[in-house]
Amino acid sequence: MCVECKACLDVCPRMPANTKSIISSDILGPYLTVKNVRSKKNCGRFQNGGAVTALLAAALEEELIDCALVMGEDRWAQKSYPRVVYDVSDLEKCAGSKYTSNAVLEPIQDVVKNVNNIALVGTPCTVQAVGLLRKSSNEFAMKLAHKVRFLLGLFCFEAFSDQLIPEVTRRLCVPSWRIDKMSAGDATMTVTLRDGGMKTIPLPEISGYVKPGCKACADFTAKLSDVSVGGVGSTPGMSVVILRTPEGVGLFKIAEERGFIEAKDGVKVKAIEKVGKLKLERNGF
């Protein structure tokens, strides 16, 4: 029931007054440093260097957070869903990229009733909403934002609806349970099967399954996060990690000092800017 608190207007990333910090020619957004990062631990079926899973594992094991709000996956149906994880074992089950997108913020109101500090992982649209919660002076918004200790953003050009999976299985003539993981790059969706086989689909052929909301998003690198992570511009086998805030740097240093991650320089920043600019221009900003 609406109580006319106006919190929704205060934090909506599609309101013109709220878009200035999101839409700009500065593709990377504000940041302190950029690194190539690889997990030093076996953290499950991670994507690229496994940086997100490793950072969250460090936060959980060092008791910096009570839980993490991430995207889980029904591996039989290949459908994603929001999941709250309280330990590293459950976290590892959620490792890896999901190309179908669902409302990761859906459980947050219930979660914050029982814990003090959470980490949240999301694509730029999710990060925009939580980032604006943090900036808001609205009482209701502040109650939620205060509980988000770490906000981790994922590079995202676009996401797909759940209807993508039936289309992929139809095109490849395989049931959904045979799919191990999917990855997108170079205008191609690569599907890795459980038996090690690989199949590909040109991305333009499945563009009709892109979520409509993605066309209203200008942010590729999740500018309002504490830490942004992605594969574009990285050294092979590693993730790009953009550290934006002192909180993000603190988490990174703890993870590095405790042996969860290793890092090195050499990120191809221009490659990130190229893809970010393409998204900005494609979506009409």
Segments predicted by a language model, with ranges:
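Portal/gating segments that form or line small-molecule/metal binding sites
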Residues: 46, 51-60, 64-113
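Long, compositionally biased charged/polar accessory segments in the mid-to-C-terminal portions
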Residues: 63-66, 169, 173-285
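Iron-sulfur cluster-binding cysteine motifs and their immediate structural context
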Residues: 1, 6-25, 227
